[in-house]
């Protein structure tokens, strides 16, 4: 079992620090049992980053009851009172931190139509443009949504 203190130490050793802006992808089941589970992980990230930083997690498109195939960490994070959620129909994000509105932009309807979830006006673009980082815990790059921004900027088909 990993304690909250051990988790704090490991995330600091990994390079997490105050004021960072991070996009988090996590599979808690892949790292083993954590004392107090998702709540510990979320609170440790908030302690380290501080509210001067920003934490972003995919909120998926579940607007109703919890769906077990989605991350419980993301589910708990997006429902916390100090977290905002973007309003994209299929690719929303949950955002926390003092400047969450800077990253947590909502979709826009323009003459071109609905803004792309990884387009230039997306939370991913805002995070990247503000020196954001990607934190992968128990996952690999196949789950890293920031890559969609890279594909978009590279005009990948």
Model-based region annotation:
Residues 1-157:
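N-terminal and secondary-structure boundary signal
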């Amino acid at each position: 079992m990993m304690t909250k203190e051990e988790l704090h130490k490991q995330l600091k050793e990994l390079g997490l620090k105050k004021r960072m802006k991070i996009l988090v992808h996590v599979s808690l089941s892949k790292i083993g049992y954590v004392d107090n589970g998702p709540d510990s992980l979320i609170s440790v990230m908030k302690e380290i980053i501080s509210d001067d930083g920003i934490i972003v997690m995919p909120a998926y498109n579940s607007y109703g009851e919890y769906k077990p195939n989605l991350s419980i960490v993301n589910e708990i994070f997006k429902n916390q009172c100090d977290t905002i959620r973007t309003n994209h129909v299929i690719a929303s994000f949950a955002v926390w931190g003092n400047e969450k509105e800077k990253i947590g932009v909502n979709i826009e309807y323009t003459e071109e139509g609905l803004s792309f979830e990884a387009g230039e006006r997306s939370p991913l673009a805002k995070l990247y443009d503000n020196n954001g980082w990607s934190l992968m815990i128990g996952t690999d790059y196949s789950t890293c949504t920031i890559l969609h921004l890279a594909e978009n900027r590279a005009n990948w088909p």
